[in-house]
């Protein structure tokens, strides 16, 4: 089965991103595929390359990066939500005249069109967070 995941919760105040990660990990272990993970609203903070968790905490960003690279999963941050929170890829950094990009490696910027495309391509869409 092919899944599309929509993650909405801020990783600092919501279980959405870690619950979505655990679901994705279990799904690929069971032989399913994850077409795309779309981070929306506060969940785009998972893609922030400038954030650094304390050394005694798990980095949700690194967990997603590893899972995505091992399983060819596309990690996409909503462009509107990301720019509101200071997260830019190279193109958006130039567009908004920012000194550098701030998106973590393995993540890309996309819009609601890509969310809809992912929903149409997947067999099931699962939403995490509120």
Specify the residue positions occupied by each region the protein language model found:
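Short beta-strand segments
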Residues: 6-8, 38-39, 79, 127-129
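A generic local structural motif
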Residues: 24-25, 61-63, 110-114
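A glycine-rich helix N-cap at a beta->alpha junction
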Residues: 53-82
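Hydrophobic/aromatic residues located in beta-strands of well-ordered beta-sheets
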Residues: 3, 34-37, 75
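Short, glycine-rich nucleotide/cofactor-binding loops
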Residues: 3-18, 46-52
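Histidine-anchored nucleotide/phosphate-binding helix
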Residues: 17-30, 37
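N-terminal glycine-rich phosphate/adenylate-binding segment common to multiple enzyme folds
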Residues: 79-130
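Short, conserved active-site loops that position catalytic residues or coordinate cofactors/metal ions
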Residues: 38-48, 81
């Amino acid at each position: 089965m092919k899944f599309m995941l929509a993650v909405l919760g801020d990783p600092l105040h919501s279980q959405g991103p870690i619950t979505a990660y655990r679901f994705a990990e279990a799904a690929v272990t069971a032989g399913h595929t994850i077409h795309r993970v779309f981070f929306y609203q506060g969940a785009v903070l998972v893609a922030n390359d400038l954030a650094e968790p304390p050394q005694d905490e798990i980095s949700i960003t690194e967990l997603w990066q590893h899972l995505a690279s091992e399983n060819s999963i596309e990690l996409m941050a909503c462009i509107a939500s990301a720019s509101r929170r200071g997260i830019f890829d190279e193109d958006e950094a130039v567009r908004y005249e920012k000194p550098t990009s701030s998106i973590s490696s393995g993540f890309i910027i996309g819009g609601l069109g890509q969310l809809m495309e992912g929903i149409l391509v997947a067999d099931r869409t699962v939403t995490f967070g509120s």
